[in-house]
Amino acid sequence: MRHRYSNRKLNRTTSHRLAMLRNMANSLLKHEVIVTTLPKAKELRRVAEPLITLGKKPSLANRRLAFDRTRDREIVVKLFDVLGARYATRNGGYVRILKYGFRKGDNAPMALVELVDRPEDAVAVEDNSAE
């Protein structure tokens, strides 16, 4: 039975998977749009949305939690100053996943991951980790 299998392993060790998702969440919060594979995008949403929810309540404890999860001061500042204010009235659903075709080398399904209500001048960053 499939019960209690909560996340995808993505063919990586635990430390590699957690580091990869942390780096992808940092890239998403920094650039506000990234391109990656569809399974990675679905796991990324589970990491990024709670971070944005933390940013909506600006307390010292939440800043420390956000820094613990991102390990990047610039991301924490943007999370609490820019993104927290932008999503103050939205109750979840901060990340949009759009199917983006298939990768040329291995035909892997790709996805464009973006923050909703983002400014239109943000440019997509390609994920070249598997190429």
Curated annotation (Swiss-Prot):
A GO cellular component entry from the record: cytosolic large ribosomal subunit
Entry-linked Pfam families: Ribosomal_L17
Tree of life domain: Bacteria
Coiled-coil intervals: none
Keyword Ribonucleoprotein annotated: yes
GO molecular function, one term: structural constituent of ribosome
Keywords assigned by UniProt, alphabetized: Ribonucleoprotein, Ribosomal protein
Complex formation: Part of the 50S ribosomal subunit. Contacts protein L32.
Record-stated family: Belongs to the bacterial ribosomal protein bL17 family.
NCBIfam families per UniProt: L17
Name the record gives this protein: Large ribosomal subunit protein bL17
Source organism: Chromobacterium violaceum (strain ATCC 12472 / DSM 30191 / JCM 1249 / CCUG 213 / NBRC 12614 / NCIMB 9131 / NCTC 9757 / MK)
